Amino acid sequence: MIGRIWHGWTKPENADVYENLLESEIFPAIAAKGTRGYRAIQLFRRPQGHEVEFITIMWFDSWDAVKQFAGEDYERVYVPAKARGVRARFDERSQHYEIRHKLDY
């Protein structure tokens, strides 16, 4: 399993707008791509002074699935134009990690 991690920040007044955009449009559009091996996405949010930080973690079965989703330059971020307007800044590259252990209790 591979985790694709990405960070973005908004101004506090745009945080709810951005979260709604993710949930109502961007996440469904990602799922609609039909990437074989794409399993899940998680959204994390926290206030950070004059910004609000968002982290997404996407779960993929394999490196091949990550590359099917993002292309050969798989660290390149996927940022729809509509989302760029409500964010203050964002990571230009995603980080990827092999998930070695997952324990659910």
Which residue ranges define each predicted feature?
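Residue-level signal for functionally critical sites in structured catalytic/ligand-binding pockets
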Residues: R4-G8, T35, A83, R93-S94
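Glycine-rich beta-strand-turn "strand-cap" elements at beta-sheet edges
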Residues: R39-E53, Y78-Y105
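Short, well-ordered beta-strand segments in beta-rich or mixed alpha/beta enzyme
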Residues: I2-W9, A40-Y74
